[in-house]
């Protein structure tokens, strides 16, 4: 395994099997994206109220959302990157709303597991620096997440 993933399930609604699939899926994505071995990621499964508060406090949007990610290795303006080959990178945290994932799975007509996988990959790509603020960025990121999910076998 490339990634060290720390799961926290505040909802007690995600099974060990589902966490194992997410772990395998993100390790597959990490391999495709050439992520260094030992990289660390935190994944929290929360309810809508918890993600609403996070979304309000960090993004200024007072409403629940499906996934939020916080990259830890991002450099701010004027910051210098400190590289140490012996320290595995701390990629950051992915926070997923379980009620939103269930709602969206039903809305899009696919399984809860597929939606959970989609949200995990989406958050993971954000940790790696991908974004969708412009049309071009969106095209690249969404194509990448679709490719990862399809190649892994987690299709709609």
Swiss-Prot record:
Function: Single strand-specific metallo-endoribonuclease involved in late-stage 70S ribosome quality control and in maturation of the 3' terminus of the 16S rRNA.
Provenance organism: Geobacillus sp. (strain WCH70)
Cross-referenced PANTHER family: ENDORIBONUCLEASE YBEY, CHLOROPLASTIC (PTHR46986:SF1)
Keywords for the protein's UniProt record, in alphabetical order: Cytoplasm, Endonuclease, Hydrolase, Metal-binding, Nuclease, Ribosome biogenesis, rRNA processing, Zinc
Gene Ontology MF: a single term: zinc ion binding
Name of the protein in its database record: Endoribonuclease YbeY
Main location: cytoplasm
EC number: 3.1.-.-
